[in-house]
């Protein structure tokens, strides 16, 4: 498992209180993991803090799945 995926998964598990098995690349934060819009905002903020990056609002709107988050963060941190 990549470092980014591992760290994103840990944040998702902690913030959404879901089982690790449910956190997959294709898992939608809202549809599969039970997040609401406030949870999404909190996740984005947690990703920003964990990876010391800024995720613009327009980009945050497109981060709908675990895989989306991993891809965006991987591109930002190199």
Curated annotation (Swiss-Prot):
Carrier of the growing fatty acid chain in fatty acid biosynthesis. Pathway: Lipid metabolism; fatty acid biosynthesis. Keywords: Cytoplasm, Fatty acid biosynthesis, Fatty acid metabolism, Lipid biosynthesis, Lipid metabolism, Phosphopantetheine, Phosphoprotein. SUPFAM superfamilies: ACP-like. Belongs to the acyl carrier protein (ACP) family. PANTHER family: ACYL CARRIER PROTEIN (PTHR20863), CARRIER DOMAIN-CONTAINING PROTEIN (PTHR20863:SF76). One of its GO terms (biological process) is lipid A biosynthetic process. 4'-phosphopantetheine is transferred from CoA to a specific serine of apo-ACP by AcpS. This modification is essential for activity because fatty acids are bound in thioester linkage to the sulfhydryl of the prosthetic group. The modification O-(pantetheine 4'-phosphoryl)serine is found at residue 37. It is found in: Cytoplasm. NCBIfam families: acyl_carrier, PRK00982.1-2, PRK00982.1-3, PRK00982.1-4, PRK00982.1-5. Disulfide bonds: none annotated. Residues 2-77 form the Carrier domain. This is Acyl carrier protein. GO terms for molecular function: acyl binding; acyl carrier activity. It comes from Maricaulis maris (strain MCS10). The keyword Membrane does not apply. PROSITE patterns: CARRIER (PS50075). GO terms for cellular component: cytosol; membrane.
């Amino acid at each position: 498992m990549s470092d980014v995926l591992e760290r994103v998964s840990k944040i998702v598990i902690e913030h959404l209180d879901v089982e690790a098995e449910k956190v997959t690349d294709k898992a939608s934060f809202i549809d599969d993991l039970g997040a609401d819009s406030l949870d999404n905002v909190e996740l984005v903020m947690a990703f920003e803090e964990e990876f010391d990056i800024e995720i613009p609002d327009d980009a945050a709107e497109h981060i709908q799945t675990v895989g989306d988050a991993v891809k965006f963060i991987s591109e930002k941190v190199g």
